[in-house]
């Protein structure tokens, strides 16, 4: 870390207060961790075309403290059920007219289920035994349970985004944030 006078500031603060330097370190670590979460959430939301709020609430931050200067980010990497994207509605498609006696490729006379901003052909809404409503779709090749919940795969984009962003942000922002936090702690100690 190449910050001018950092060692001197740390030494002075350590002489004045025992908790000032660890408090500054914890503050800087927490800021870096929360910015890593928000940047990763934005990147995943852009890639998967899911609202940023839905992605961000899958990450939990256990904040660093004076006694334990480690922040822990826990991410739920499970697939996102489509029903969470927003209101589900059936849109009638009048473009594909069929002749009398022919079966439609899309069941229900050419209607398509739209959830949020996604069109899901051949899907329907059903209440499961656990009481939750989900968007279901028939799955070819599954003999025993031929219907399945429609989900958006999130494991790969979340993993790659968090691994990239955490390392990059730690390199770029931690020294700056540590400097700001030390200055803040110094101001707090001087005010007392």
Label each PLM-derived region with a short phrase.
Residues 1-192:
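Short, Lys/Arg-rich flexible segments
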């Amino acid at each position: 870390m190449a910050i001018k006078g950092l060692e001197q500031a740390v030494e002075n603060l350590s002489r004045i207060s025992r908790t000032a330097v660890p408090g500054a370190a914890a503050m800087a670590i927490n800021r870096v961790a929360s910015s890593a979460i928000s940047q990763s959430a934005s990147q995943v939301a852009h890639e998967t075309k899911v609202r940023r709020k839905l992605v961000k609430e899958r990450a939990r931050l256990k904040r660093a403290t004076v006694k334990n200067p480690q922040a822990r980010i826990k991410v739920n990497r499970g697939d996102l059920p489509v029903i969470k994207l927003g209101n589900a509605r059936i849109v009638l498609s009048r473009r594909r007219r069929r002749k009398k006696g022919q079966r439609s490729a899309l069941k229900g006379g050419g209607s398509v289920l739209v959830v949020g901003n996604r069109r899901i052909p051949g899907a329907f809404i059903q209440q499961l035994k656990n009481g939750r409503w989900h968007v279901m779709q028939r799955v070819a090749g599954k003999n025993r349970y031929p219907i399945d919940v429609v989900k958006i795969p999130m494991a790969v984009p979340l993993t790659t985004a968090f691994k990239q962003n955490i390392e990059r942000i730690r390199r770029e922002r931690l020294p700056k944030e540590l400097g700001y936090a030390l200055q803040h702690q110094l101001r707090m100690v001087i005010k007392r």
